[in-house]
Amino acid sequence: MQMQNSQIQGLGHADLVQAPDDSWWMICLGYRTSGYLQHVMGRETMLAPVEWAKGGWPVVNGNGTLETDMPCNTLPLVPMAQDPEREEFDFIKRNAHADSYHALGLPMGWMSLCNPDYSNYSLTERKGFLRLRPSTTDLSETASPTFVARRQTELNFSATALLDLSQLIEGMQAGITAYAAPLNHYDVVVECRNGKLFAKSVVRLGQTSHSEKELPLSGNKAYLRITSDKDFYYMQASSDGTHFTTLAKMEYRFLSTETIGGFTGVMLGLFTQSEVQTDGYVDVDWFEYRTTIQP
């Protein structure tokens, strides 16, 4: 009963491990909740200190509970490679191989949906850019749209992308999304109509799709952003990267496991789609993901 109001929930699949210094630890799965005791980040691997006296029972964290912060003696720290905050889509800088999707030069944390059509993705046609060609499959179908994304890892974050839309033609859409499932995602979408670009919010909840506000864009570039403050996702757009307009805000709980099921959590990514086959495309200059860890 001590855990019922804890931010950490859904614990299971635990293993007890003894470290080289004879200290004991528990590795398990669990998820972090927020205001509504719901979670959007899927099940994560967690580590907790264990006291195990000879002849006694193991006790986790002194009282049998897990917290986001648990004071304890730690093992020697080992530096780990970190993904850059800003992905600039230059596989040459990383000496990565570009023959297959998983080695496009993106960190291994990037992913697509189902079996991607590799011809819709390129890092070589324009150096330093990720070129996305639209699919006639859209985000709300159970198939493989043109889509690349990474996991949401904190409740407080900002995800921003700079898109070159000079080859976005009418009938196409491109954007950034907080994606939980085909019928549950929050998007910032750019469309071209009569030669002009417009950004809008699209909220997909089950069989309902809703757009609240539209923003005319100047020029052929757009800065698209989704942020979260633990309770809401905010969908934003800008022509200059400095002055952002909030197009909509939606509660994060509508993308949570408790609302829609599943256990893998929200992805933050880029997509393009079209009503018909087209020669248009979108070039992504960079994608930036910044997080703030808060208690």
What do these predicted regions represent?
Residues 1-295:
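Carbohydrate-active catalytic/glycan-binding domains of CAZyme proteins
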